[in-house]
Amino acid sequence: MTRVKRGYVARRHRNRILALTSGFQGAHSKLFRTANQQGMKALTYAYRDRANCKRDFRRLWITRINAAARENQITYNNMIHSLYMNQIHLNRKILAQIAALDKDCFVEILRIIK
């Protein structure tokens, strides 16, 4: 069987991996084997945290809405239920922004659903 040296293909592969990990500390950006492992781990974390980010933001929005609603003597649960019953279609992101930036508008929404 003939020997395959791979030439520039192997070097290009290694350089691509090292470029991916260029901001990492120590051997994780210098040595190919550890850089390759850390690069795969980084991609795994990125995939996982894309879902976690959505989860965390939804939790933050709910907390902000609940805090603003309780200032007006209504719980988050009752408020969301009343919004659906009155067919007011505002998502949690928009409600949280209204609660934080425009208190008068938020109070008006609560007045409509009570």
From Swiss-Prot:
Species, as recorded: Psilotum nudum
Lineage of producing organism: Eukaryota, Viridiplantae, Streptophyta, Embryophyta, Tracheophyta
Localization per record: Plastid, Chloroplast
InterPro entries (alphabetical): Ribosomal_bL20 (IPR005813), RIBOSOMAL_L20_CS (IPR049946), Ribosomal_protein_bL20_C (IPR035566)
Family classification: Belongs to the bacterial ribosomal protein bL20 family.
PANTHER family: 39S RIBOSOMAL PROTEIN L20
GO BP term, pick one: translation
Protein name: Large ribosomal subunit protein bL20c
A single cellular component GO annotation: chloroplast
Signal peptide as annotated in the record: none
Gene this chain is encoded by: rpl20
Location, primary (coarse class): plastid
GO MF, one annotated term: structural constituent of ribosome
Keyword hit for Glycosyltransferase: no
Record-annotated disulphide pairs: none
Keywords for this protein: Chloroplast, Plastid, Ribonucleoprotein, Ribosomal protein, RNA-binding, rRNA-binding
